């Protein structure tokens, strides 16, 4: 089966492929909010029907949360599993969007045409690059070049609570030669990238309670403990003035990268100034003594994601609030153990409490360790060749600052290696207002997967 007519078909069908993606993007499949449960079901149904349209035996599989979509195409050669997720992040704050987030559109920008809307880059646009590549192969040759299993999740943005039980229950069905994941970005625009390591994730949150009820700040101001002031003091104490996390044992299992790897990352084409300026920074912040890429890819973090309490309405209300709340996450590297680290963080926070300040922790949040990819597998070199041919420059092996738990679960649950290839850019504003995905990334992403399928099936 020849590749050139497949690439020509992709080029000709690009407008139709964008319209098809827009149909999926219009479904507000926000997994973390129960109000959107029906929409997550609709997105799963949409994908089942779309996969069936290209000859995939696809079905929606129930879980205690949102459904999985699983599909199979038989064929010769290697057995590949493709993973993506159809759920998206919440759209708050809505007033910062330039247009409704679930009304996708094409925009002209100084850097070319982009698709704008929630899920364009994370991850609906990305997962559809693979499906569109398969569609083109099917249209031109009547079949796909190899055996493929499709595994599409609906809870990635809400911690994947159903993922491991589903994988364990369906291990025999999902087991493949290698997993392909399209949920990552390129190190710089136009630089094709294969992720060789990611960071793990730990989530937690707590509530501080001071007085039993909100108090009059005149009657009690002075002698009363203010939980908002206490939570601010505690949060500020979690880092020192060099940006290091102060939790005892936090850096256990963290390793320095080699000089060779540091040199490779330094030569990968990363534009630090553009990366920082795009979000309003003039310099890198964080742990002292490390480059921006090292901070993003090889160092752990403890980030405060939300801090609130007291009166939030218009005007003023002179109260000392009863409660204050904090949400935080940690990005993990190396051999950091999320369960052990959670215990250490909680113990440290509790050691900072003053008398009469009570704490309650969330009990339902899970963590995942940092996965490392087996780049010695021949599929990595085959994919690098395919990507280099499409983008007319050498593909690079990079780290990723984000967390994709499924990458580690394929190894720990199914004994499979994974390869992460994505076409997003750092300025795509994923998880933020005005998320976008470059039309070029979508187009060349489809072509890239078509080439990768050809290489892996040769």
Q: What are these language model-derived features?
A:
Residues 207-209, 231, 298, 316, ...:
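Zn-dependent metallopeptidase/amidohydrolase metal-coordination segment
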Residues 145-226:
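Histidine/acidic-residue-rich, glycine-tolerant segments that coordinate divalent metal ions
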Residues 2-94, 323, 327, 340:
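N-terminal helical capping/dimerization or prosegment-like subdomains
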Residues 330-333, 360-376, 401:
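A short beta-alpha structural unit
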Residues 77-152, 444:
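Active-site metal-coordination/substrate-binding segment of hydrolases
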Residues 233, 309, 314-344:
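C-terminal catalytic subdomain
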Residues 190, 215-219, 366-368, 428-441:
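Short beta-alpha connecting loops at secondary-structure transitions
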Residues 196, 217-307, 336-358:
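Acidic-enriched catalytic cores of C-N bond-cleaving enzymes acting on peptides and small amides
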């Amino acid at each position: 089966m020849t590749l050139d007519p497949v690439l020509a078909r992709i080029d000709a069908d690009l407008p139709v492929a964008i319209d098809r993606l827009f149909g999926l993007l219009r479904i507000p499949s926000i997994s973390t909010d129960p109000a959107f449960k029906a929409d997550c079901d609709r997105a799963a149904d949409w994908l089942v029907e779309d996969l069936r349209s290209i000859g995939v035996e696809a079905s929606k599989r129930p879980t205690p949360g949102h459904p999985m979509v699983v599909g199979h195409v038989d064929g010769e050669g290697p057995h590949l599993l493709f993973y993506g997720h159809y759920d998206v992040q919440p759209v708050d704050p809505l007033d910062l969007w330039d247009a409704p987030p679930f009304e996708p559109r094409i925009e002209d920008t100084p850097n070319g045409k982009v698709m704008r809307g929630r899920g364009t880059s994370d991850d609906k646009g990305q997962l559809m690059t693979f499906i569109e590549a398969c569609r083109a192969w099917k249209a031109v040759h009547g079949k796909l070049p190899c055996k493929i299993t499709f595994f599409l999740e609906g809870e990635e943005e809400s911690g994947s609570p159903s993922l491991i039980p589903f994988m364990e229950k369906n291990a025999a069905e999902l087991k493949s030669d290698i997993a392909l994941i399209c949920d990552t970005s390129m190190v710089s625009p136009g630089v094709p990238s294969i992720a060789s390591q990611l960071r793990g994730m730990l989530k937690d949150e707590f509530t501080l309670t001071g007085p039993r009820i909100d108090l009059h700040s005149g009657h009690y101001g002075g002698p009363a403990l203010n939980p908002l002031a206490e939570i601010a003091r505690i949060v500020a104490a979690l880092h020192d003035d060099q940006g290091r996390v102060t939790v005892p044992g936090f850096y256990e299992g963290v390793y320095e990268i080699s000089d060779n790897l540091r040199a490779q990352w330094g030569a990968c084409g990363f534009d630090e100034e553009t990366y920082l300026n795009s979000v309003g920074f003039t310099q890198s912040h964080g742990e002292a003594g490390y480059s921006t890429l090292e901070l993003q890819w090889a160092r752990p973090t403890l980030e405060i994601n939300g801090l609130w309490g007291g009166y939030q309405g218009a005007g003023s209300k002179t109260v000392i609030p009863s409660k204050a709340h904090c949400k935080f996450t940690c990005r993990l590297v190396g051999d950091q153990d999320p369960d052990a680290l959670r215990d250490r963080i909680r113990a440290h926070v509790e050691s900072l409490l003053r008398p009469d300040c009570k704490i309650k922790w969330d009990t339902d949040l899970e963590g995942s360790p940092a996965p490392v990819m087996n780049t010695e597998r021949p599929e990595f070199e085959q994919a690098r060749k395919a990507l280099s041919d499409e983008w007319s420059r050498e593909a690079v092996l990079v780290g990723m600052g984000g967390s994709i738990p499924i990458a580690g679960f394929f190894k720990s649950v199914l004994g499979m290696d994974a390869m992460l290839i994505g076409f997003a850019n750092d300025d795509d504003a994923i998880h933020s207002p005005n998320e976008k995905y470059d039309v070029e990334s979508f187009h060349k992403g489809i072509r890239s997967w078509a080439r990768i399928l050809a290489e892996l099936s040769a």
